């Protein structure tokens, strides 16, 4: 049996042209439920969720500051102005407290990579 989160990560990676390079799932309470082995969300999961809820103008992940480009109650897209990439949070579904967090290469188009991550997140409905 395959890992549904790894499958979603692979989908986002492939559909983004290899731009999505880190992936995780966190709960609204800040619990890390799954993360790819190339980053650690544990220290920042709670503050990431707070940033989404408050529609913060910036968010910090792994000591890197990202400026919020777009924020809704169910998503956040932020870019590091020094070129350290794009951070995306999107809710798996409206009735869940689970969120996908993804990091994409700085060369990615924010709107396009958001769509790739959101589509991958939606495949996780009821699976995590």
From Swiss-Prot:
Highest taxon in the source lineage: Archaea
GO CC aspect terms: cytoplasm; cytoskeleton
Chief place of localization: cytoplasm
Family of the protein in this entry: Belongs to the Asgard profilin family.
Key words of the record: Cytoplasm, Cytoskeleton
Official protein name in the record: Thor profilin
Listed Pfam families: Profilin (PF00235)
Any one Gene Ontology molecular-function term assigned to this protein's record: actin binding
Function: Has no profilin activity against rabbit actin.
Gene3D superfamilies per the UniProt record, alphabetical: Dynein light chain 2a, cytoplasmic (3.30.450.30)
Record's subcellular location: Cytoplasm, Cytoskeleton
InterPro entries named among the record's database cross-references: PFN, PFN_sf
């Amino acid at each position: 049996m395959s890992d549904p989160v790894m499958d979603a990560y692979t989908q986002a990676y492939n559909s983004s042209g290899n731009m999505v390079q880190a992936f995780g799932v966190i709960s609204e309470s800040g619990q890390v439920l799954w993360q790819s082995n190339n980053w650690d969300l544990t220290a920042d999961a709670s503050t990431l969720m707070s940033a989404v809820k408050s529609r913060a103008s910036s968010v910090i992940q792994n000591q890197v500051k990202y400026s919020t480009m777009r924020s809704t109650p169910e998503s956040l897209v932020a870019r590091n102005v020094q070129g350290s990439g794009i951070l995306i949070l999107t809710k798996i579904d409206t009735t869940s407290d689970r969120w996908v967090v993804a990091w994409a290469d700085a060369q990615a188009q924010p709107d396009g990579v958001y769509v790739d991550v959101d589509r991958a997140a939606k495949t996780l409905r009821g699976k995590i």
